[in-house]
Amino acid sequence: MERVLDFVGEYNLNKSIYNEFADKINYILNTDADRIIFDFHECKWFHASLTSVLGGMISICNKNNKNVILDIANGSAVADFFNRAGLFSEHFNYKPKEKKNA
């Protein structure tokens, strides 16, 4: 069974965003789904400091035997950010562009 967690809007550093992440983590811990899709299609901005929180969420999923997919629109600002930073590519729903200077 799979469940989708939506990431909608702008993810800046503020209390409401951290509360949203806490709610998502609680949901992950309490669902019996074995596949969790993090849907970033409606995400317009994702602060770099939140990548550690996202990584923690992925780690929690892995430790609870839940497969994670990052559903990100190829070419979106969020996908480009994660790709440039080399983050989470093993979880992308598409193959990230190869780095030209690597």
Regions picked out by a protein language model, each given a short descriptive name:
Residues 1-35, 42-55, 59-102:
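Bergerat-fold GHKL ATPase/HATPase_c domain
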